[in-house]
Curated annotation (Swiss-Prot):
Keyword RNA-binding listed: yes
Family note: Belongs to the bacterial ribosomal protein bL31 family. Type A subfamily.
Keyword entries, A-Z: Metal-binding, Ribonucleoprotein, Ribosomal protein, RNA-binding, rRNA-binding, Zinc
Matches recorded under InterPro entries: Ribosomal_bL28/bL31-like_sf, Ribosomal_bL31, Ribosomal_bL31_A, Ribosomal_bL31_sf
GO cellular component, one term: ribonucleoprotein complex
Gene: rpmE
GO molecular function per UniProt: metal ion binding; rRNA binding; structural constituent of ribosome
Name recorded for this polypeptide: Large ribosomal subunit protein bL31
Binding sites annotated in the UniProt record for Zn(2+): 16, 18, 36, 39
Subunit-level organization: Part of the 50S ribosomal subunit.
Function: Binds the 23S rRNA.
Names of required cofactors: Zn(2+)
Length: 71
């Protein structure tokens, strides 16, 4: 392998909005996530509303002018 072309692989902390902190190694410095293994709805069995309004609004704006005609 060539030297000097690979990104630096360093210790990283992954922080979830629930407060869980995971230490691992990555090429990124610090990573912030919305859902982790401690608060994921499938694992905890609790219902959690995930905000996807931004994506839905962008989709609706993008396809607002498209007619719903079937050929």
């Amino acid at each position: 392998m060539k030297e000097g072309i690979h990104p630096e692989y360093k210790e990283t902390t992954i922080t979830c909005v629930c407060g869980n902190v995971i230490t691992t190694r990555s090429t990124k410095q610090d990573i912030k996530v919305e859902i982790c293994s401690q608060c994921h709805p499938f694992i905890t069995g609790k219902q959690k509303i995930i905000d996807t309004a931004g994506r839905v609004e962008r989709f609706n704006q993008k396809y607002a002018g498209v007619n719903n005609k079937k050929a």
